[in-house]
């Protein structure tokens, strides 16, 4: 977890440090999971506040939906990592992924937004291979931290190497208000689906 990739300050190491000290038995697994979820929520809050300050109200509303429904998350510490055992949360993960990439498109250059497609796909590839959605959030935290370091360290290189005019032109429609409202509707439905499926 930590700061959003692309912020000028380095990604926060607290999520990774928390995992290490939990594995070492310094803090309990239950407390660690609770703290990590709150770090996650603070990160989402930071993003939606940024969108609100920039006047991107549809995107800020999307972030608000994701933040509000994040309280559905319930984690369990297992061995040396944590899982979210409810399969229903796949809907929330999908909504979160859409929201986060939308944030990237609106706040970063097009090459960096393209880079974050791979970053956001990483935890999905993990669960596709393992057929287990439980560790999705753990893997998202790992990819988030690693990508944040790459983003900040190699931002210039990424902007040069991933510059594709075709992608820039085709993705421009995402900034339209009508598109943002459609994304708001889609993310809201996914998050509500997680709520209903969880029962």
Go through each PLM region and give its residues.
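Generic multipass alpha-helical transmembrane bundles of integral membrane proteins
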Residues: 31-146
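N-terminal topogenic module of multi-pass integral membrane proteins
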Residues: 1-56, 145, 160-199
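Membrane-interacting alpha-helical segments
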Residues: 128-131, 158, 162
């Amino acid at each position: 977890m930590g700061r959003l990739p692309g912020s000028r300050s380095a990604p926060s190491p607290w999520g990774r440090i928390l995992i290490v000290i939990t594995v070492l038995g310094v803090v309990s697994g239950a407390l660690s999971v609770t703290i990590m979820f709150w770090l996650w929520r603070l990160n989402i809050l930071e993003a939606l506040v940024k969108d609100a300050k920039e006047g991107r109200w549809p995107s800020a509303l999307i972030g608000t939906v994701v933040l509000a429904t994040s309280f559905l998350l319930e984690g369990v510490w297992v061995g040396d990592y944590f899982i979210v055992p409810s399969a229903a949360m796949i809907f929330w993960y999908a909504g979160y992924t859409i929201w986060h990439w939308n944030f990237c498109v609106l706040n970063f250059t097009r090459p960096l937004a393209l880079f974050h497609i791979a970053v956001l796909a990483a935890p999905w590839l993990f669960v596709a291979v393992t057929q287990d959605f439980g560790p999705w959030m753990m893997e998202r935290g790992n990819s988030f931290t690693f990508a944040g370091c790459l983003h900040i360290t190699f931002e210039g290189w990424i902007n040069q190497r991933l510059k594709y005019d075709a992608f820039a032109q085709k993705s421009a429609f995402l900034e339209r208000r009508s598109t943002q409202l459609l994304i708001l509707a889609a993310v809201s439905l996914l998050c509500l689906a997680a709520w209903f499926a969880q029962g």
